[in-house]
Structure formats: C-alpha cells, structure tokens
C-alpha cells in the first residue's frame, strides 16, 4: 500500500513541477523566411512553441538560438499567415515521440504526426501520457556497442557475394537519378531478416510516395513497418527533422530488443534541407557550398544506428550523386562515416543490368567479421576478374585484344558473360546465401593461381 502511495505521490509531484500558474507568452517581432524573432523569458534551445496565425490556426516552431535582443525560432511549417505581434506560447518541452506497437503500419509526417488512417502517431505533446523519448539525442557511447559478427543476407547475389552485410551495419547506397535505388531499397526490405522496418522518405515526390505504398509494400510488410514521409513540398525544417524522427523510432524499437532495419532515402535531400535552414540562420557557407551545421548533423544522425546490448539497427542510407561522381561533398562526407557503400552504375542500368550494382566500386568494411576465409578468397578473385576485364574492355570493343599475353585477363574475358549472369537478378526472387556462395566458388575456381 505504501509503495503504491509513494508512486502516486512521485507521479503527481512530477506533474506539479511542470505546472506553471503564470502563462508565459511572447510576441513575434520579425519574420525572416523560416526564422521568427521574438522575446520569450527563460526559453531553452530545442523547446517547442505554438505561434498563432491570423486565421486562428497554430504553427509549431522550435527555438534554435538567441541574440542579445531576441529569441530565434524556426517554423516547423510554412510561416504564411504569421504577422508581427502574433502571440507565441512556449510549450516548455523539446520535440519528443511516443513509440509502441500501435505505430506499426502507420504513415507519419516528418514530426511523427499521422498522415493517413486512424493511427495516433508518434508526436508527443506536453500533455502526452506515454513514455516518450527525444527526437534529437546523442548516440550510444562506443563502449556500449557490441562488435558486428552476424551476417545479414539480402537474398541479392551481387551483394551477398561481394559486399555481405552484417546485423547492425550502416551502409550507403550511392546512385544517380534513375538507377533503381528506390526499387533496390524495397527489395532489401522484403528480403532481409528483421522484426521492424522504419522507412524515412525525405524530399520524395508525392506521387512516388503513393506508388511506393501500393506497389512495393505488401500487406505483410506494411504490418511490421513504420513510414516517416516529408515530401519535397514540405518545409525545410520538416524535411530535415524527418531523418531524426525515423531514427528515433528505430532506436525505440531497438531498446525493446528488436532487430530493426532503417531505410533512409535520402541523406542528400536531408543535407539540402539543412542547408536551407543554415543559410536562413545566417551560417557562412563552407566546403561544397554547405554550411557547417550539415557536417555537424550528418555524423550525429548516422552514429545513432548500429548495435546495442539489447537489439540492433541495420541502416541503409541512399545518397544521390551527380553525373556518377563520388566527389560530391555530401557523398564524400557520408562515405567516410559509414561502414560500407554500395554503388549503382548508370552504365549498367542503361544496359538493362539490374540490380545495377558496380561490385568493383562497392565495399563493406566489416566483411571479414561476417565471412569465412573461403568466401573472402572467392570475393577477392571475383574482384580480380572484374578489374582485369575492365582494363581490356575498350580493346575488346575495338577488336584489338590479343589473347595469350595474360592468363588472368584471358580467364576474365572468357568468364565475363557468366559473371554478369551471376550478378543479374530479377525482382522478388531472393537467393539463399549458401546457393550464392556455391555459385561464387564455382565461378572463381576457374581463375588460375
């Protein structure tokens, strides 16, 4: 009885400590693009506020900074209808979400609010009674991250043979527009062994979102998935926040001991949204025309995925590259942060070679942790054959290649069609890992020692 009474007292003491008898209200003094200037006493960076529009509707905004004279708020939606003198009510809480099994099958906006159906959503207001967690949070300490040791087959021969992934790995999918990255991402979601799938679709066209829901996700997959969507017409704040919302949802399921697959499309559009926010906030432009906040937030985002003592988040981040160049500043930065990368080739896509994975340019930094010596040796031989063929490809097209000079190159030319047939694969036809390994060993055994 005493224990129950103490719990009741503690709960009500916590609620009373958050209660303020004086209603604090600020006023908008200036509107600069997505930034609002006002004065709010005792405000903290990260706190949410409600801004009243001229028509009586409310706009959420977040405190992002201060000057000597005013508080700076970033509007979480279009600031249309905001006028000077509009009242601002600080909510006294940061952006938080509540996560439970009721979220499975839901489609949410960038802040965690429901977009369709009767889903409650994840967004937690100040009166929310659920157990909540912050959307913007720190990653787990390195000492609390177990080593990646378990393979996570994808059912795709081109990946499982040369870039076999591990549970808890963070991988980048680098591709130009039209190379099939979204289709490949959906195929990975269908094939990979996981308990929960969290999709983060950032800056996508609205039409593509509906097509993705209807054609790529069947009912079984939908029942164990959560989709966080911020289409290209949404505010830059929502597009940038969607990546953190999806990651926070994945973290909540991982804390419950589940294996989570996080698919974020794309980090490039996240960086572009953050660039808009940085420029509006007055940040100077740095390398690649990006403000410093982009390079600060990218590692804060991707480091939150990975293994924990309870569960795991295996993360796949797509990155758009222009003209198939890996020297794009976002691509270059992301490649240095992740545990591996898969590169899609436009040349292969134009030939009808799908999935258009350039095995030679793709790599997994934890491959040795999840494969045996035979697999590693066969993988090295496959790459050797692909590299040897690439060196003489132009000579073959011109009819100038002379066989007999190098036995490795001769073998690469003879096996080229067989290798391409091995790396091609139709959709919705997953191949068991052992079958992939057997075919890989058979192919590469013909390479002379």
Curated annotation (Swiss-Prot):
GO terms for molecular function: ATP binding; ATP hydrolysis activity; protein-exporting ATPase activity; proton-transporting ATP synthase activity, rotational mechanism. It catalyses: ATP + H2O + cellular proteinSide 1 = ADP + phosphate + cellular proteinSide 2. It comes from Pseudomonas syringae pv. syringae. This is Type 3 secretion system ATPase. The keyword Translocase applies. Coiled coil: none annotated. Its EC number is 7.4.2.8. Keywords: ATP-binding, Cytoplasm, Nucleotide-binding, Protein transport, Translocase, Transport, Virulence. It is found in: Cytoplasm. It comes from the Bacteria.
